[in-house]
UniProtKB/Swiss-Prot annotation:
Gene, per the UniProt record: Erap1
Protein name from the UniProt record: Endoplasmic reticulum aminopeptidase 1
Residues that, per the record, bind substrate: 172, 306-310
GO CC terms: cytoplasm; endoplasmic reticulum lumen; endoplasmic reticulum membrane; extracellular region; extracellular space; membrane
Residues of the active site: 343
Glycosylation-annotated residues: 59, 143, 403, 655, 749, 890
Gene3D superfamilies given in the database record: 1.25.50.20, 2.60.40.1910, Neutral Protease Domain 2, tricorn interacting facor f3 domain
Places the protein is found: Endoplasmic reticulum membrane
Function: Aminopeptidase that plays a central role in peptide trimming, a step required for the generation of most HLA class I-binding peptides. Peptide trimming is essential to customize longer precursor peptides to fit them to the correct length required for presentation on MHC class I molecules. Strongly prefers substrates 9-16 residues long. Rapidly degrades 13-mer to a 9-mer and then stops. Preferentially hydrolyzes the residue Leu and peptides with a hydrophobic C-terminus, while it has weak activity toward peptides with charged C-terminus. May play a role in the inactivation of peptide hormones.
Record bears the keyword Plastid: no
PTM annotation, UniProt: N-glycosylated.
Membrane topology value: Single-pass type II membrane protein
Entry keyword annotation includes Amino-acid biosynthesis: no
Taxonomic source organism: Rattus norvegicus (Rat)
Keywords, alphabetical: Adaptive immunity, Aminopeptidase, Disulfide bond, Endoplasmic reticulum, Glycoprotein, Hydrolase, Immunity, Membrane, Metal-binding, Metalloprotease, Protease, Signal-anchor, Transmembrane, Transmembrane helix, Zinc
Amino acid sequence: MPSLLSLVLTFLAVSSPSCCQNSDTASPKASNGASFPWNNMRLPEYITPIHYDLMIHANLSTLTFWGKTEVEITVSQPTSTIIMHSHQLQISKATLRRGAEEMLPEEPLKLMEYSAHEQVALLTAQPLLAGSVYTVIITYAANLSENFHGFYKSTYRTQEGERRILAATQFEPTAARMAFPCFDEPALKASFSIKIKRDPRHLAISNMPLVKSVTVAEGLIEDHFDITVKMSTYLVAFIISDFKSVSKMTKSGVKVSVYAVPDKINQADYALDAAVTLLEFYEDYFSIPYPLPKQDLAAIPDFQSGAMENWGLTTYRESALLYDKEKSSASSKLGITMTVSHELAHQWFGNLVTMEWWNDLWLNEGFAKFMEFVSVTVTHPELKVEEYFFGKCFNAMEVDALNSSHPVSTPVENPAQIREMFDEVSYEKGACILNMLRDYLSADTFKRGIVQYLQKYSYKNTKNEDLWNSMMHICPTDGTQTMDGFCSRNQHSSSTSHWRQEVIDIKSMMNTWTLQKGFPLITITVRGRNVHLKQEHYMKGSECFPETGSLWHVPLTFITSKSDSVQRFLLKTKTDVIILPEAVEWIKFNVGMNGYYIVHYGDDGWASLNGLLKEAHTTISSNDRASLINNAFQLVSIGKLSIEKALDLILYLKNETEIMPIFQGLNELIPMYKLMEKRDMVEVETQFKDFLLRLLKDLINKQTWTDEGSVSERMLRSQLLLLACVHRYQLCVQRAERYFREWKASNGNMSLPIDVTLAVFAVGAQNTEGWDFLYSKYQSSLSSTEKSQIEFSLCISQDPEKLQWLLDQSFKGEIIKTQEFPHILTLIGRNPVGYPLAWKFLKENWNKIVQKFELGSSSIAHMVMGTTNQFSTRARLEEVKGFFSSLKKNGSQLRCVQQTIETIEENIRWMDKNFDKIRLWLQKERQELL
């Protein structure tokens, strides 16, 4: 997981959608030209794996490995064909034993391969009998992957400059088949016995503890690992390296260890302590003991995503696990804690109970994202993570407001379609609708439901409806009040008594959130004591919403000027009326932003709330203030609110001190001038940036150049000083220049305050000498935070040659790791000097980029959006359309392409409608902030 609310707040973060492509529907032909006996991306249901015996022998000198897989299977109907997954494996021999005993004779199997589906067919001479057990034995060899998936090569350099090689795995979603032939679908769970052959100077680790090590030849050791629990193939993991480790025990006797390269093992203590605390929390919260004897956390030098939940051996980017007490930032501590929490939550949600198929990935990822906040709120209260949750919902809404979005639960089939599911909708929206349900039912009732779900489906697979059925048992629909009244609610209504009892049908309610895309816009119109409600599908791209037929069961919450007690109302129809006990001056819906919807206040509703913010903004919570900012600008996009009124509302920020309203204000305002930077609008762009600095000037001037304060205060300081320095606020620039001179004079040995380092580096990188010095320190730094800060600073250079060099070197991966390339490309794509270079680089190197990062991956989506989605001219739109349409199957159908095209179209409409209004508003309001 990237550091929360970090660099991207200044250079607008892009979404991480993925892509899809159609499966091959032609008559299948095997690699030898013969007819392949199976024509489906999914494996047949009549063969089930029971147990795998895996032997892996990797040679880290030749970068090859060979393996032997013995898989015990059962057959439910007679067949002469065994269909398995295999990708880029050279199978040399395949045999069959008719039984599970090793002493039984082996008979040869005829092998056929169909690479389009990444499948092999093993044909038997005599049919397999229903109800019988068989063992398939396959011997094979392959190259270690040069990418970030399968069984792949990773490298690092020691402090002395020696290059060392290790091998690690990343199998989710469909890459276990790149390491061993298998039944690579999440519902085909089995147990695994793993043996690894290695050089004596290396260490092997896997899902389970080491049972014994045997010397099988001179210079060759075979490690035997304990048998696993029943689990999906994508959770298998093994690493061969020279890592060092530190360990602790949980109260229940689970050994927790953190592994890292030797030079960085001193940065493992924070994650180790966090992991122990979080594992103990989850065992208590879920009322289910962690089922394995150990939990390893390994920091991999080359890693495409943030982390991976392999059962018993979670893997991470170094930046997502290692914490340097001297140099790591407050946001880094927050990010590491959340990432460790996420992966450990998966040990229950995802590993113990797994979605049946990838269409319900959100059952894994939405829950893990949600549990990050539930757990860390308790285990690390000083981080105040509850303040940041609603920001995840805004991220999801950015994607979910587009026509190219998809339901939380949506059909997928081929690997690229599966990879596209790893996006904001599965993660953030999934988490947000769970939080909304928890808020509505109460934390205790919700917890009872998910514990029942986990207990019922342990070591099994589930579908969307299984979760809601578990909740239904907690909240029956027979009209009786249970669980302290949480399942039958009294709520305001338009009935003559002003109250009615509302029975909650969890399944029907939540299906409206998981089986249809998008989210509702709730329009509130107050007439005396009557509050008129209307819901419609919020969708960008039109000021007149199409009648989609979408209807949600919306658990509304509200407070008023007369009562800060949260009131609730379940809106299940297109319109309804709430009758208040008395007239009110203002009403605020979606309290705390716990609901996944946005609100428009009709008539003078926005004027009342604007007045509240100007006169007494602390009357409502900081989350409520931030949600008003977000909702106002979302309404500008669809023509429900004028840009002038939204900008008027945000003027109150000159009196704001809390992190989330300020960050939300920046998230709304920065994209506006980023659009202007890419067009010839220098005068208004400059005026807008000046306005932003004046708006926050008092707060910027109050920032100390220290590391004092809470995590949120430190994160706010870092971002405000960076903003001020990047926009050449002289008080900031002068101090940053002085710090940089002193730091450079010390050859980078002087300790800078961590919170101001980013601003100092950003200023220092603006001349050639400073840029070159920063790059030299990047090469030798052992701190992930410091490397990230330098990387950002190098990317905001105004020197096109430097920017082009960064693109070239990060893509080659020799000096700057290839895993950094998507981020570097996106940062340069946000740079007003660099964006043409980034877009050109993406186009010219598309085929190579897809080979490195896989069609459908979130990295590809990140790069597509990051280089194009701040365009706002018709010429650029046609250029983007033309390029991607020319790719055909190699990219034209990517969801991220549809998203960026929609976004550019929206940018064009937005600028056409609002640019002149902003120019006039700036002239009118200029004096107000002086």
